[in-house]
Amino acid sequence: MNYAETILPEFDREMANTRKVLERVPENKLDWQAHPKSHTIGWNANHLAEILGWVEGMLTATSWDFAPVGGEPYQSPKLTSWREILDLFDRNVAAARKAIAAVKGDQLTQPWSLLKAGTPLFTMPRATWMRSFVLNHLIHHRAILCVYLRLNDIPVPGMYDPSGDE
């Protein structure tokens, strides 16, 4: 069994669950935040939409410098409409799925590094990055967004079983 055959069923389930949550995000609450030190609903929704945009580069390049010396630092999207957020999410899901399906041989055991100004912050095998930096990271922010929805009396969709709202 290759990597795609083992990870894509889980990937598809988690992306469908994430989309269900993003579909509930109200545009009039994008600026809402639970605490002054917390990110807003909009920031979390944008982050969920962007995370999968990192997959192709992670699987094909050896590193990513999100703040290169002499270059422009990476900027997270700041989309302000529900439709734009969902469209970015859908595009990134499709691109990530295609990149995962194309993984060959020892590609996942090869190291990949996250850099800041040329300095490695972390270096791990690509498979570890996929699990922690992509899937676990996405599920973490999805859970935060679910709490934010709940705090705003917005029905939370079930992920693995029906939610208290279903």
Could you describe each region identified by the protein language model?
Residues 1-9:
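Short, charged, low-complexity loops and linkers
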Residues 8-19, 29-73, 114-166:
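Short, contiguous alpha-helical
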Residues 24-31, 99-109, 150-156:
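Surface-exposed helix-capping loop/turn segments at secondary-structure junctions
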Residues 76-114, 125-142, 147:
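Acidic/histidine-rich alpha-helical segments that form the ligand environment
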